[in-house]
Amino acid sequence: MDALIAQLQRQFRDYTISLYQQGFLDDQFTELKKLQDDGSPDFVSEVLSLFFEDCVKLISNMARALDTTGTVDFSQVGASVHQLKGSSSSVGAKRVKTLCVSFKECCEAKNYEGCVRCLQQVDIEYKALKTKLQDMFNLEKQIIQAGGIVPQVDIN
């Protein structure tokens, strides 16, 4: 059993480090993880669930605003992008946050094609991040179920 736990912990460390190296996460995610303790073991997953729910709503709102035969309200799209950027920044979703910067620039320039392209990229990145984090949380659960302790991963 100890060998299994050690293997799962190694997998967890390697996987987590890869999420930072690939740019999915930044230091803000590390700070978020530090807020989790024994009294609130699901804190991070709950915060991320709320983040992903917000992503769905904001992406849907932006898609509706851009899918119009009339005039696009770029200020409305920009406001949603700004909100998504803030949310992604607060949870350490680096790729999503970075895309939001470009998306905001397209809104300010009233660049319809750029906005549509950025929306598609944001949608892809948020879904990829969600899948990656679900995999990470599954590894955490496996470690705990095997009787182990989820290791702290030092990224610096």
UniProtKB/Swiss-Prot annotation:
User: Biological process (GO) annotations?
Assistant: antipodal cell differentiation; cytokinin-activated signaling pathway; embryo sac egg cell differentiation; phosphorelay signal transduction system
What's the PTM story here?
A: Two-component system major event consists of a His-to-Asp phosphorelay between a sensor histidine kinase (HK) and a response regulator (RR). In plants, the His-to-Asp phosphorelay involves an additional intermediate named Histidine-containing phosphotransfer protein (HPt). This multistep phosphorelay consists of a His-Asp-His-Asp sequential transfer of a phosphate group between first a His and an Asp of the HK protein, followed by the transfer to a conserved His of the HPt protein and finally the transfer to an Asp in the receiver domain of the RR protein.
Query: Record's Gene3D superfamilies?
Result: HPT domain
Q: Which residues carry this modification: Phosphohistidine?
A: 82
Principal localisation: cytoplasm
Q: Does the keyword Magnesium apply?
A: no
SUPFAM superfamilies reported in the protein's UniProt record: Histidine-containing phosphotransfer domain, HPT domain (SSF47226)
* A Pfam family: Hpt
Keywords, comma-separated and alphabetical = Acetylation, Cytokinin signaling pathway, Cytoplasm, Nucleus, Phosphoprotein, Stress response, Two-component regulatory system
Positions where N-acetylmethionine occurs in the chain: 1
**GO CC annotation terms, alphabetical:** cytoplasm; cytosol; nucleus
**Which GO MF terms are attached to this record?**
histidine phosphotransfer kinase activity; protein histidine kinase binding
Where does the record place it? Cytoplasm, Cytosol; Nucleus
Cell cycle: is it a keyword of this entry? no
Q: Where is the HPt domain?
A: 40-147
The entry's free-text remark on domains says:
Histidine-containing phosphotransfer domain (HPt) contains an active histidine that mediates the phosphotransfer.
Q: Could you give the subunit structure recorded for this chain?
A: Interacts with the B-type response regulators ARR1, ARR2 and ARR10. Binds to AHK1, AHK2, AHK3, AHK4, AHK5, ETR1 and CKI1.
What is this protein's record name? Histidine-containing phosphotransfer protein 2
Organism from which the protein derives: Arabidopsis thaliana (Mouse-ear cress)
Name the gene for this chain.
Answer: AHP2
